[in-house]
């Protein structure tokens, strides 16, 4: 059950000049499910991408990394769901390359101009023959249809759009889709994210922007603490809005475009948490007054990924000990626990090393019963802060994963 998340309509997701979308039923996932997506990219576009840090990364990740920086430029992204093509050895790479070659024939480019992406069951051979056979049968699609086609255990398609001024004269459009529900943890989580914009950005600058946006959005979420083998986040800049190229991070338009795309990416990232497997609550954990951003992030993740804390949220249990314990084992050097303050929404619940004198169990229960909760922790040792987004851990998470292959 997704937390305050609804499906976007095609009208809410405008087309991006220079991008064409296609989908098909390849039979990789389950019969009757659309499970294949192709994003065709206009010549002259630039692409930035970041990938999972899991050392067991999937075959398509290896291929996508090598094709990203090819001098010929990226002309297509092909995405299948139902099979991750991970843990498949050399044959997995052969299959991913075969899919690239077939997609290249379909749109009229070179195989090295196609980036492959897969998501689904690990340790199963990719049925490349099904994907190759389905490519000629693909039909034009809208963004909301593409968002549905890349889903695995997701319950709601995830898509968003933004429009805004970049520079004095040009309006920039951006639309993106993402998938993810379980195996969600930073660097990156089991998620795929694709954003297209009509802005014009040089490839090196777009690559840097993509990494920065990932760090500020998709790398601030956690559902279950597992880092997947297939995670990928891609930004495509088609350059079709007639503006001059952004080729330097000192260009004021860099910050303007990054802010616009960051807003879009954060909505997609939060949508993944809202649709976390079995989630019934959306939780924001913010740590303030840390010495460094890394320290703040470390403390926030300790609270956000703790199974004890997450199950307490599911149970609407205002027991504070689990939250304080999580901060205590976050390995923040020389932490003075007497200075730490913790809030549930705006209610002070802990200070001076223990329970706040003003706090009552009834206050905590009222907050914990909500479906959206903010936990704010003040360390009182500096000016740095970090925010992490998570969800509760319910019986539904166990059921979904127990039944995933059945």
UniProtKB/Swiss-Prot annotation:
Molecular function GO labels: glutamate N-acetyltransferase activity; L-glutamate N-acetyltransferase activity
Site (Involved in the stabilization of negative charge on the oxyanion by the formation of the oxyanion hole): 119-120
Organism expressing this protein natively: Neisseria gonorrhoeae
Taxonomy, superkingdom: Bacteria
Subcellular localization(s) per the UniProt record: Cytoplasm
Function per UniProt: Catalyzes two activities which are involved in the cyclic version of arginine biosynthesis: the synthesis of N-acetylglutamate from glutamate and acetyl-CoA as the acetyl donor, and of ornithine by transacetylation between N(2)-acetylornithine and glutamate.
Catalytic activity, EC: 2.3.1.35, 2.3.1.1
Active-site residues, record numbering mapped to chain: 190 (nucleophile)
HAMAP family to which the protein is assigned, alphabetical: ArgJ
Family classification: Belongs to the ArgJ family.
Record protein name field: Arginine biosynthesis bifunctional protein ArgJ
Annotated substrate binding sites: 152, 179, 190, 277, 401, 406
Catalysed reactions, as listed in the record: N(2)-acetyl-L-ornithine + L-glutamate = N-acetyl-L-glutamate + L-ornithine; L-glutamate + acetyl-CoA = N-acetyl-L-glutamate + CoA + H(+)
Chief location category: cytoplasm
Any single GO CC term annotated in Swiss-Prot or TrEMBL for this entry: cytoplasm
Record text on subunit structure and interactions: Heterotetramer of two alpha and two beta chains.
Record-marked site positions (Cleavage): 189-190
Gene Ontology process terms (BP): L-arginine biosynthetic process; ornithine biosynthetic process
